[in-house]
Amino acid sequence: MNAPLVGPSGRSPHWVANAVLATIAGIGRSLDVALQAATGGASRRRSADRQLLEEFILPTFSLDRSIKRVLFCGCARYTQAYEGLFPHSEYWTLDPSPRRQRFGSKLHVVDRLEALHRHAVGPLDLIICNGVLGWGINDTEQAEAAIRAAHAALASRGRLLLGWNDVAPRNRVRPEHITALAAFTPAPLSHFGARVRVPGWHRHVFDFYRKA
């Protein structure tokens, strides 16, 4: 077997790789059908990190019934079906561009994450911020404000997912350099560690946190 996609936490690499493959094999086809139906056949990004997000990370979060209110930051055609993966949650989306509102959920906010305090969306149990660091949140001041806003909006023990590309110039603001993240603790998801690195040219990283 090839080397596993990501580094595990407390499990052997082969055990984790097999678990991921089994999960994807079991739900991948049904998710493809559901997502295509929900988007009217809209195109989806099939990079390794997007596949991991859609076929493992989001479904794992959706199975946690303590997650009752979700905010997904950043909207595009290929994200508009994600609302259907959280049938038991109140699902919000956020994007600063009015043109992207059509890709958002029924509960949508047109604004930046830094300004989340202006909107009555909390308390949230999960904030998903994938592909926003380096793609809109581009400097330390913006990142600090965004993480502070996320922390304020999250319920006690709420979860935060940061997905970012560890390649210049997208990694100009690394999570390690965001002091506001000191108010969170790393929080492994299922069989993965608190940091998941996905091989590929853009070196995507998923970081999982819980509000301290």
Where are the regions that the model predicts?
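Class I S-adenosyl-L-methionine
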Residues: N171-A212
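A short glycine-rich, Lys/Arg-flanked "PGG" loop and its adjoining helix->strand segment in the class I
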Residues: Q142-S156
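A conserved beta-strand element that flanks and buttresses the S-adenosyl-L-methionine
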Residues: I128
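Short catalytic micro-motifs in class I SAM-dependent methyltransferases
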Residues: G131-V132
